[in-house]
Amino acid sequence: MSKLNDKHERVRARVREAFILFEHKEGSRLVDFKDVPTAVRACGVNPTAVQMTHILDQLAALNAETDATGYVGLENFELVVCNFLIQQEASLFRDDYHTLLRAFRAFDPDGRGFIDAESFKSLLTGKGEALSEDELAKMMTVAADGEGKIWYEDYAQRLANDGRTI
Protein backbone atom coordinates (compact mmCIF):
# COMPACT_ATOMS: atom_id res chain seq x y z
CA MET A 1 0.00 0.00 0.00
CA SER A 2 1.33 3.45 -0.83
CA LYS A 3 2.09 6.08 1.80
CA LEU A 4 -0.84 8.16 0.59
CA ASN A 5 -3.25 5.25 0.97
CA ASP A 6 -1.81 4.49 4.42
CA LYS A 7 -2.40 8.08 5.46
CA HIS A 8 -5.96 8.08 4.11
CA GLU A 9 -6.69 4.84 5.96
CA ARG A 10 -5.29 6.29 9.22
CA VAL A 11 -7.47 9.37 8.81
CA ARG A 12 -10.51 7.25 7.99
CA ALA A 13 -9.93 5.04 11.05
CA ARG A 14 -9.59 8.08 13.31
CA VAL A 15 -12.77 9.64 11.92
CA ARG A 16 -14.69 6.38 12.44
CA GLU A 17 -13.41 6.11 16.04
CA ALA A 18 -14.54 9.66 16.77
CA PHE A 19 -17.92 9.02 15.16
CA ILE A 20 -18.52 5.90 17.25
CA LEU A 21 -17.82 7.83 20.46
CA PHE A 22 -20.77 10.10 19.70
CA GLU A 23 -23.07 7.62 17.99
CA HIS A 24 -26.71 8.39 18.87
CA LYS A 25 -27.57 4.78 19.68
CA GLU A 26 -25.05 2.00 19.49
CA GLY A 27 -25.10 0.55 16.02
CA SER A 28 -27.35 3.29 14.59
CA ARG A 29 -24.54 4.78 12.48
CA LEU A 30 -25.98 8.22 13.31
CA VAL A 31 -24.61 11.18 15.27
CA ASP A 32 -26.78 14.03 16.50
CA PHE A 33 -26.02 17.10 14.37
CA LYS A 34 -25.30 19.16 17.52
CA ASP A 35 -22.52 16.69 18.47
CA VAL A 36 -20.67 17.05 15.16
CA PRO A 37 -18.27 19.80 16.34
CA THR A 38 -17.24 17.74 19.35
CA ALA A 39 -16.91 14.60 17.24
CA VAL A 40 -14.68 16.46 14.78
CA ARG A 41 -12.49 17.69 17.65
CA ALA A 42 -12.33 14.11 18.94
CA CYS A 43 -10.33 13.39 15.79
CA GLY A 44 -7.50 15.28 17.52
CA VAL A 45 -7.84 18.59 15.69
CA ASN A 46 -8.97 22.11 16.53
CA PRO A 47 -10.76 23.64 13.56
CA THR A 48 -11.61 27.34 13.64
CA ALA A 49 -15.22 28.51 13.77
CA VAL A 50 -15.06 29.25 10.04
CA GLN A 51 -13.71 25.77 9.29
CA MET A 52 -16.35 24.17 11.52
CA THR A 53 -19.10 26.15 9.81
CA HIS A 54 -17.82 24.88 6.46
CA ILE A 55 -17.96 21.27 7.71
CA LEU A 56 -21.46 21.75 9.13
CA ASP A 57 -22.68 23.38 5.91
CA GLN A 58 -21.38 20.48 3.84
CA LEU A 59 -23.03 17.96 6.16
CA ALA A 60 -26.31 19.89 6.12
CA ALA A 61 -26.28 19.90 2.31
CA LEU A 62 -25.69 16.14 2.21
CA ASN A 63 -28.40 15.59 4.81
CA ALA A 64 -30.85 17.65 2.75
CA GLU A 65 -30.24 15.27 -0.14
CA THR A 66 -31.00 12.22 2.01
CA ASP A 67 -33.90 13.67 4.04
CA ALA A 68 -32.07 13.04 7.32
CA THR A 69 -33.35 15.27 10.10
CA GLY A 70 -31.21 16.14 13.08
CA TYR A 71 -28.67 13.38 12.55
CA VAL A 72 -25.59 12.77 10.43
CA GLY A 73 -24.88 9.33 9.03
CA LEU A 74 -21.48 7.68 9.22
CA GLU A 75 -20.92 7.77 5.47
CA ASN A 76 -21.56 11.51 5.17
CA PHE A 77 -19.54 12.29 8.30
CA GLU A 78 -16.65 10.18 7.07
CA LEU A 79 -16.71 11.72 3.59
CA VAL A 80 -16.79 15.35 4.74
CA VAL A 81 -14.47 15.07 7.74
CA CYS A 82 -11.86 12.89 6.01
CA ASN A 83 -11.69 15.27 3.06
CA PHE A 84 -11.44 18.22 5.41
CA LEU A 85 -8.68 16.65 7.53
CA ILE A 86 -6.61 15.71 4.51
CA GLN A 87 -7.02 19.09 2.79
CA GLN A 88 -6.51 21.23 5.90
CA GLU A 89 -3.90 19.10 7.65
CA ALA A 90 -1.30 21.81 8.31
CA SER A 91 -3.77 24.23 9.91
CA LEU A 92 -5.27 21.70 12.31
CA PHE A 93 -2.45 20.45 14.49
CA ARG A 94 -2.74 21.04 18.20
CA ASP A 95 0.03 22.97 19.88
CA ASP A 96 2.56 20.91 21.75
CA TYR A 97 3.04 20.92 25.51
CA HIS A 98 5.92 23.42 25.54
CA THR A 99 4.10 25.92 23.32
CA LEU A 100 1.02 25.74 25.55
CA LEU A 101 3.13 26.04 28.68
CA ARG A 102 4.78 29.23 27.39
CA ALA A 103 1.36 30.66 26.58
CA PHE A 104 0.00 29.91 30.05
CA ARG A 105 3.12 31.30 31.72
CA ALA A 106 2.50 34.61 29.95
CA PHE A 107 -0.62 34.93 32.13
CA ASP A 108 1.26 34.02 35.31
CA PRO A 109 3.87 36.78 35.71
CA ASP A 110 4.44 35.83 39.36
CA GLY A 111 5.31 32.23 38.44
CA ARG A 112 2.78 30.68 40.84
CA GLY A 113 2.09 27.71 38.57
CA PHE A 114 -1.58 28.49 38.17
CA ILE A 115 -3.86 31.08 36.68
CA ASP A 116 -7.19 32.24 38.01
CA ALA A 117 -10.09 30.48 36.26
CA GLU A 118 -12.22 33.63 36.11
CA SER A 119 -9.42 35.60 34.46
CA PHE A 120 -8.89 32.77 32.00
CA LYS A 121 -12.61 32.68 31.19
CA SER A 122 -12.62 36.38 30.37
CA LEU A 123 -9.64 35.87 28.05
CA LEU A 124 -11.40 33.05 26.23
CA THR A 125 -14.60 34.98 25.72
CA GLY A 126 -13.11 38.38 24.98
CA LYS A 127 -10.22 37.78 22.59
CA GLY A 128 -9.88 36.04 19.25
CA GLU A 129 -12.35 33.29 18.48
CA ALA A 130 -14.66 33.29 21.51
CA LEU A 131 -15.89 30.04 23.00
CA SER A 132 -19.59 29.45 23.51
CA GLU A 133 -20.96 29.28 27.07
CA ASP A 134 -21.37 25.51 26.71
CA GLU A 135 -17.81 25.02 25.42
CA LEU A 136 -16.47 27.24 28.19
CA ALA A 137 -18.38 25.35 30.89
CA LYS A 138 -17.09 21.99 29.64
CA MET A 139 -13.56 23.33 29.42
CA MET A 140 -13.64 24.75 32.96
CA THR A 141 -14.91 21.44 34.31
CA VAL A 142 -11.65 19.87 33.18
CA ALA A 143 -9.33 22.87 33.60
CA ALA A 144 -10.12 24.37 37.00
CA ASP A 145 -9.76 22.81 40.41
CA GLY A 146 -12.27 23.27 43.24
CA GLU A 147 -10.63 26.53 44.28
CA GLY A 148 -10.95 28.22 40.88
CA LYS A 149 -7.32 27.71 39.88
CA ILE A 150 -5.99 26.28 36.65
CA TRP A 151 -2.72 24.48 37.29
CA TYR A 152 -1.43 25.03 33.82
CA GLU A 153 1.37 22.45 33.67
CA ASP A 154 -1.18 19.68 34.09
CA TYR A 155 -3.72 21.36 31.86
CA ALA A 156 -1.17 22.01 29.09
CA GLN A 157 -0.40 18.29 29.14
CA ARG A 158 -4.07 17.48 28.65
CA LEU A 159 -4.44 19.95 25.81
CA ALA A 160 -1.22 19.08 24.02
CA ASN A 161 -0.91 17.08 20.89
CA ASP A 162 -0.88 13.47 21.96
CA GLY A 163 1.63 12.55 19.28
CA ARG A 164 -0.86 11.19 16.77
CA THR A 165 -0.37 12.20 13.21
CA ILE A 166 -3.11 12.92 10.78
UniProtKB/Swiss-Prot annotation:
Function (record text): Component of the nexin-dynein regulatory complex (N-DRC), a key regulator of ciliary/flagellar motility which maintains the alignment and integrity of the distal axoneme and regulates microtubule sliding in motile axonemes.
CDD domains, A to Z: EFh
A Pfam family the protein falls into: EF-hand_7
Matches recorded under PROSITE patterns: EF_HAND_2
Keywords of this entry: Cell projection, Cilium, Cytoplasm, Cytoskeleton, Flagellum
Species this chain originates from: Chlamydomonas reinhardtii
UniProt family annotation: Belongs to the DRC8 family.
Subunit structure: Component of the nexin-dynein regulatory complex (N-DRC).
Transmembrane spans: none
Full protein name: Dynein regulatory complex protein 8
Subcellular location: Cytoplasm, Cytoskeleton, Flagellum axoneme
Record InterPro entries: CALM/Myosin/TropC-like (IPR050230), EF-hand-dom_pair (IPR011992), EF_hand_dom (IPR002048)
One cellular-component annotation, GO: motile cilium
Domain EF-hand: 95-130
GO MF annotations in UniProt: calcium ion binding
PANTHER family found in the cross-reference section: DYNEIN REGULATORY COMPLEX PROTEIN 8 (PTHR23048:SF32), MYOSIN LIGHT CHAIN 1, 3 (PTHR23048)
